[in-house]
């Protein structure tokens, strides 16, 4: 074994070889040196573990090829672009919504230059960062006032901390949802200092349940929109206008967490009814919160809208500063909201809306173009076909809605489909799809036409290895 260690070349010899690699030309020399040292430590560990037992495996040409691959892989940015071919539009693991081009340009402009983030250009005095989107939010939703924090969980936390800290909040037992990542409404409420008062049963809650729970310590009646699941069958929940009327009768504030709330009415496109923010506010509810990066199709943000007296109190909460959004999020959100001033323009230009409302005929045509491209580029490496399938909205939205689509199915001939899947994840720009019936499937709903060539190149590179 000791003789094998002597066959491992020096770091300097590898550096001389790798510094000729144009793909590594921009890599700082010290980082290159450190990565080569890591690779050589790995080689020594392979000898100790008995993985390498023959000196032929330690030939310089063999090790140099491995070292190059190791350095290229380890030196890539950890946060990277991926191609989403899963058909899940608001894919939580892949960054949820992608931004409209107008929002991307607004972010770039705000980053390259100074901005009026907190300056009132009319007076030359200090202004509020919330002013950039508050009027837009009010115009689009009908709210009296609004503000934005860094995500919807933060929005819920801030509302409860401001309006109900140390007092009871009455919520239906069937609405104590988990919002993802093990974050649950009861835990968020506990952190806010509010006291949870559950009423009703999991499947049925009546207005009298809320009324009977109200006592001297009650501060708020809360409703949580269960956008990420449905209870069907023997089920009843209280309509928001009735809850609002009860709150006003008893002198209590009312609050609805819409979760992945939307400003766009999807029902004309065959979707089941889903309340819009505008509809919810028309019920008279005092405060509504919703996400920015789900059905809205903007950046991650928690939007709070409602009656001015409550929003002003929330703005003054010291916790608000810890939860406030930055200039890049504000730039992206304002640009996204401006598109909603014309709903049809929003449907066409906000990628999330365009993907969700894409017509089956359009998707079938795009799948055909992708199939022809892959059939040509992967000839002899895989069989390519199209088949009917379903996409999903994702992001905890429309959980029962299957979206008809046309899938492109790739069945490799020289490797198993899981090896193809893993190989695509290891590409410089990973391609994420789904495996069905022994084939790797691509859904054109979440693919851009400009990505067809990239997908074809990645698949060819993996299948030809």
UniProtKB/Swiss-Prot annotation:
<keyword id="KW-0648">Protein biosynthesis</keyword>
<dbReference type="Pfam" id="PF12390">
    <property type="entry name" value="Se-cys_synth_N"/>
</dbReference>
<keyword id="KW-0808">Transferase</keyword>
<keyword id="KW-0663">Pyridoxal phosphate</keyword>
<comment type="similarity">
    <text>Belongs to the SelA family.</text>
</comment>
<dbReference type="InterPro" id="IPR015424">
    <property type="entry name" value="PyrdxlP-dep_Trfase"/>
</dbReference>
<keyword id="KW-0711">Selenium</keyword>
<feature type="modified residue" description="N6-(pyridoxal phosphate)lysine">
    <location>
        <position position="294"/>
    </location>
</feature>
<dbReference type="InterPro" id="IPR015421">
    <property type="entry name" value="PyrdxlP-dep_Trfase_major"/>
</dbReference>
<dbReference type="GO" id="GO:0001717">
    <property type="term" value="P:conversion of seryl-tRNAsec to selenocys-tRNAsec"/>
</dbReference>
<comment type="function">
    <text>Converts seryl-tRNA(Sec) to selenocysteinyl-tRNA(Sec) required for selenoprotein biosynthesis.</text>
</comment>
<dbReference type="Pfam" id="PF03841">
    <property type="entry name" value="SelA"/>
</dbReference>
<dbReference type="InterPro" id="IPR018319">
    <property type="entry name" value="SelA-like"/>
</dbReference>
<dbReference type="GO" id="GO:0001514">
    <property type="term" value="P:selenocysteine incorporation"/>
</dbReference>
<dbReference type="GO" id="GO:0005737">
    <property type="term" value="C:cytoplasm"/>
</dbReference>
<dbReference type="InterPro" id="IPR025862">
    <property type="entry name" value="SelA_trans_N_dom"/>
</dbReference>
<dbReference type="GO" id="GO:0004125">
    <property type="term" value="F:L-seryl-tRNA(Sec) selenium transferase activity"/>
</dbReference>
<protein>
    <recommendedName>
        <fullName>L-seryl-tRNA(Sec) selenium transferase</fullName>
        <ecNumber>2.9.1.1</ecNumber>
    </recommendedName>
</protein>
<keyword id="KW-0963">Cytoplasm</keyword>
<dbReference type="InterPro" id="IPR004534">
    <property type="entry name" value="SelA_trans"/>
</dbReference>
<comment type="pathway">
    <text>Aminoacyl-tRNA biosynthesis; selenocysteinyl-tRNA(Sec) biosynthesis; selenocysteinyl-tRNA(Sec) from L-seryl-tRNA(Sec) (bacterial route): step 1/1.</text>
</comment>
